[in-house]
Amino acid sequence: MSNSSPETVSQPSQEVKYGEREIAEGQLITFPNPRVGRRYDINITLPEFTCKCPFSGYPDFATIYITYVPDERVVELKALKLYINSYRDRYISHEESANQILDDFVAACDPLEANVKADFTPRGNVHTVVEVRHTK
């Protein structure tokens, strides 16, 4: 049994948590493609994307699907997860979030092809899917 009083346990801490720090410091990291010259697809699903509507401030939820054909670099998955988590408190539209993710992804790994699909959870009886593409 803990000696902590309920008041102590429920007090919000001003200390930055390690996960928050990793998200804030996160950037897309890449490593060398182990099979340069071989054309293959990498499919990534990120089911916990969140951001905030720039008009209402309400949270938006989406599953982000990234499919790409690597050239010389491959994206490291933990770094990608932290990058995606950095959108949590950003006020950004569905359209801009999908485009920004693609722009940053292409800048990081310069793939031969990339596709980002943002499938947003319906809100107010509206279901939005934004799909953007890049071809080298």
Swiss-Prot record:
GO terms for molecular function: preQ1 synthase activity. Coiled coil: none annotated. One of its GO terms (biological process) is queuosine biosynthetic process. It is an enzyme of class 1 (oxidoreductase). Belongs to the GTP cyclohydrolase I family. QueF type 1 subfamily. Catalyzes the NADPH-dependent reduction of 7-cyano-7-deazaguanine (preQ0) to 7-aminomethyl-7-deazaguanine (preQ1). This is NADPH-dependent 7-cyano-7-deazaguanine reductase. It comes from Nostoc sp. (strain PCC 7120 / SAG 25.82 / UTEX 2576).
